[in-house]
């Protein structure tokens, strides 16, 4: 098939420099939001910047624009993505909000998009805008300048994230500061991109080591985190903690003693068995 992470001139060889790490459907039309580390998508090598929207059959979703040729200044019809937006660095996760906007989370410093007014058929020109770790875009890729305006972002490294109720986003990793506030490897942003003070108060001192994975069960409204920590909010925790979506600890969840290593992934099933 087609996709990112494949050398289209040598389909049998996987290009490990490219990858996908998020795959999400838009509820209204089932088009697919894809993100990771890639600069082209599909057999037609559609130029993208780590994020794209594909058809519900995961084919390229593009529009045709006439661009001048550097060779003779004639116009050539070129394909560009309908989602004309993206990031300089690969997002860790991307999400679709309840009103079908796109939120990208990661160790991101710049938003970018193709400038069709300055581009040529042979080479696309990108415009860049500074962002701070988390950004929001429209379905066609325009940057939402009102979202997280003048935010500082993360000091450290974001490793994972999940979307919870009301378009909130919980971000985890190895970091000591987020938007100028001292934190311990976990934060929650509300729908407008500011820190959720209730959640931050409830998690207290957070984790005393890296949080590497996070998963959310929307039916049970529970968050599971795993990582290289032995305490969470000052209470012993053997690399796994379950939280309620307000940041309070689920006191019923007790993991058995582990020896010889740490958990690196956990998720909560919908059944109660």
Predicted regions and their residues:
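Extracytoplasmic mature domains of secreted or surface-exposed proteins
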Residues: 1-273
């Amino acid at each position: 098939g087609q996709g990112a992470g494949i050398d289209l001139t040598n389909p049998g060889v996987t290009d490990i420099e490219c990858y996908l790490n998020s795959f999400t459907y838009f509820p209204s039309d089932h088009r697919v939001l894809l993100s990771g580390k890639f600069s082209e998508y599909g057999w037609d090598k559609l130029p993208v910047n780590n994020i794209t929207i594909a058809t519900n059959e995961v084919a390229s979703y593009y529009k045709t624009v006439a661009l001048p040729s550097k060779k003779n200044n004639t116009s050539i019809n070129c394909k560009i993505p309908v989602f004309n937006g993206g990031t300089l660095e690969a997002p860790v996760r991307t999400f679709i909000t309840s009103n079908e906007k796109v939120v990208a989370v990661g160790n991101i410093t710049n938003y970018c998009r193709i400038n069709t007014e300055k581009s040529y058929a042979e080479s696309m020109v990108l415009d860049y805008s500074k962002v701070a770790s988390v950004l929001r875009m429209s379905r066609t890729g325009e940057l939402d300048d009102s979202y997280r305006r003048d935010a500082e972002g993360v000091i450290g490294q974001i490793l994972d994230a999940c979307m919870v109720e009301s378009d909130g986003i919980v971000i985890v990793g190895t970091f000591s500061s987020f938007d100028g506030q001292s934190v311990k490897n976990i934060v929650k942003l509300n729908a407008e991109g500011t820190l959720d003070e209730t959640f931050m108060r409830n998690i207290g001192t957070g984790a005393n080591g890296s949080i590497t994975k996070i998963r959310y069960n929307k039916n049970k409204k529970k968050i599971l985190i795993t990582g290289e920590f032995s305490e969470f909010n000052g209470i012993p925790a053997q690399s796994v903690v379950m939280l309620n979506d307000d940041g309070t600890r689920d006191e019923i969840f007790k993991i058995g003693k582990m020896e010889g290593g740490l958990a690196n992934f956990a998720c909560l099933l919908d059944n109660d068995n």
